[in-house]
């Protein structure tokens, strides 16, 4: 049954299906009670003008270059290098304060823990190597350096690791890691968590096993350009891999440092516990980089980070969870022109009250659950994405209102092209005070194409409202042809008549609102 005059992607859909085999999925076990569904809905044509939007304006990325980073490096004042004990240092309290945390470093250093500090000006790594005893920091072969102690960049320090360094190895046995409390520039090099016993990378073995990491605190700037980082991070706070984080709330009040920032450009991250993590970070840019075969997440901005740009990256092979996820009030950010594929769960996730974000022009395919997932995050614009051959839904929207889906192509996904639903999460282990939610969902779907999805193009349960306009539905996988699920299925003939035959916008509205049903 051909419902639309142009078949611009149907041949591609057929080819994908033949080449890859149909995506398959099993329904997950329901772990929380579902709300009562609305009984009756009205279907009517809606005015078109409010639905018409110009393509979203994208941020200008031309200034985020390797050359621009070089101009930021102030080499005028030579810095100081010293060895100091790790205790009494604000930058290291997270790792040695309370709960017998210092035992990790006592054991690894066989004595009172100490670190290498860079203060009061610019130091490059080759200079640093000349100022630290060889048992702590040495050149093991030309251009290859091994650090056996943590390296800390002080508040007025600038550390530069550049192309003169072929590789910086951070010793797992020695307990080495990098903490930036000033400015850190890593360009044209490699930084690797290193297992001396194996004379090779500190590849992941266990979540609790220490591996080297990089952490930049509040008030800092971090620039990583044309660099490979590998085998970082484990399941300890702020030790996840590459982390950019404001100080903990009590320390942040005392120290009064602004939110950290920085750029990552043209770099590669692999075998990291988290490829990237940030907390209360602003204006950070991750551009044209590769995140591959990381353990839990590829890119994971968190808590109250804002105005982030995640653009032109390739994220794949994440082993436990999602490729790209922003979670807990990560607002006003751009996730654009990325590829996210072959990840264990979803390709891109917007989670926990993250609002006013743009997810646009991404290619998201072969993920083991959804292409794009929105959980409890309203007021987001999803524009011009291609969601192909994901095992579950192309786009899934849960407990989120005013979600605008424009010009997306969801094709050959295992279940539904676009799936909207509500869920009561109060019976789960969620902290409702920290992460509140409303059991409401509303969608506007304009343009694009929903083709050859296993369970149909669209399914929406108990929406506050749904508007559909110019949505092309082609190549149904069911012998019965196009079938809409959820509340749309009950009024399918009317909806398709308005949407397809009359080319009108369709508004589906419940007669009784969710609040009335809850009462």
Swiss-Prot record:
Keywords: Alginate biosynthesis, Isomerase, Periplasm, Repeat, Signal
Organism of origin: Pseudomonas putida (strain ATCC 47054 / DSM 6125 / CFBP 8728 / NCIMB 11950 / KT2440)
UniProt pathway: Glycan biosynthesis; alginate biosynthesis
Active site per the UniProt annotation: 302
EC identifiers of the protein: 5.1.3.37
Claim: Signal is one of the keywords in the record: yes
PbH1 repeats: 219-246, 281-303, 305-328, 330-352, 354-376, 377-399
Pfam families, sorted: Beta_helix (PF13229)
Catalytic reactions of this protein: [(1->4)-beta-D-mannuronosyl](n) = [alginate](n)
Subcellular location: Periplasm
Signal peptide: 1-25
Keyword Signal among record annotations: yes
GO biological process: alginic acid biosynthetic process
Protein name (Swiss-Prot/TrEMBL): Mannuronan C5-epimerase
Known role: Catalyzes the epimerization of beta-D-mannuronate to alpha-L-guluronate during the synthesis of the linear polysaccharide alginate. In addition, is part of a periplasmic protein complex that protects alginate from degradation by AlgL by channeling the newly formed alginate polymer through a scaffold that transfers the alginate polymer through the periplasmic space to the outer membrane secretin AlgE.
MF annotations from Gene Ontology: isomerase activity
Family: Belongs to the D-mannuronate C5-epimerase family.
Any single Gene Ontology cellular-component annotation: periplasmic space
């Amino acid at each position: 049954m051909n419902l639309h005059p142009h078949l611009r992607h149907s041949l591609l859909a057929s080819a994908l299906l033949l080449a890859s085999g149909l995506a398959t999925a099993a329904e997950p076990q329901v772990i929380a009670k579902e709300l009562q569904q609305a009984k009756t809905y009205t279907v009517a044509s809606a005015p078109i003008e409010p639905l018409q939007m110009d393509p979203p304006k994208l941020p200008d990325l031309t200034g985020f270059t390797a050359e621009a980073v070089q101009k930021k490096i102030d080499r005028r004042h030579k810095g100081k290098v010293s060895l100091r004990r790790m205790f009494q240092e604000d930058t290291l309290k997270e790792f040695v304060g309370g709960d017998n945390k210092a035992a990790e470093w006592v054991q690894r250093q066989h004595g009172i823990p100490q670190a290498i500090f860079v203060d009061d000006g610019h130091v490059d790594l080759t200079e640093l190597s000349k100022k630290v005893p060889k048992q702590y920091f040495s050149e093991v072969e030309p251009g290859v350096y091994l650090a056996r102690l943590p390296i800390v960049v002080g508040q007025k320090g600038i550390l530069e690791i550049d192309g003169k360094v072929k590789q910086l190895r951070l010793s797992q046995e020695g307990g080495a890691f990098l903490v930036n409390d000033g400015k850190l520039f890593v360009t044209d090099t490699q930084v690797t968590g290193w297992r001396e016993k194996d004379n090779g990378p500190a590849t992941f073995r266990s979540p609790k096993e220490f591996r080297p990491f990089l952490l930049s605190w509040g008030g800092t700037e971090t620039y990583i350009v044309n660099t490979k980082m590998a085998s970082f991070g484990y399941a300890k706070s702020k030790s996840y891999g590459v982390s950019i984080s404001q100080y903990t709330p009590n320390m942040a009040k005392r120290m009064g440092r602004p939110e950290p920032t920085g750029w990552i450009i043209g770099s590669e991250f692999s075998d990291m516990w988290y490829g990237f993590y940030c907390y209360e970070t602003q204006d950070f840019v991750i551009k044209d980089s590769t995140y591959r075969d990381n353990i839990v997440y590829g890119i994971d901005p968190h808590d109250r980070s804002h105005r982030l740009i995640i653009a032109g990256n390739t994220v794949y092979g994440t082993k436990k969870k999602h490729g790209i996820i922003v979670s807990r009030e990560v607002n006003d950010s751009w996730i654009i022109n990325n590829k996210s594929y072959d990840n264990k769960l979803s390709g891109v996730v917007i989670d926990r009250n993250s609002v006013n974000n743009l997810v646009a022009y991404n290619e998201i395919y072969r993920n083991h659950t959804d292409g794009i997932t929105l959980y409890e995050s309203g007021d987001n614009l999803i524009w011009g994405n291609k969601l192909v051959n994901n095992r579950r839904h192309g786009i899934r929207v849960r407990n989120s209102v005013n979600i605008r889906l424009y010009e997306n192509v969801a094709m050959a996904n295992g279940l539904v092209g676009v799936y909207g639903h509500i869920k009561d999460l109060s019976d789960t282990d969620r902290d409702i005070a920290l992460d509140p939610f409303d059991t409401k969902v509303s969608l506007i779907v304009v343009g694009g194409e929903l083709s050859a999805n296993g369970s149909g193009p669209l399914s929406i349960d108990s929406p506050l409202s749904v508007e559909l306009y110019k949505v092309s539905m082609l190549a149904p996988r069911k012998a019965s042809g196009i079938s809409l699920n959820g509340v749309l299925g009950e009024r399918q003939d009317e909806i398709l008549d308005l949407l397809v035959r009359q080319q009108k916008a369709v508004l589906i509205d419940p007669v009784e609102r969710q609040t009335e049903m809850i009462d």
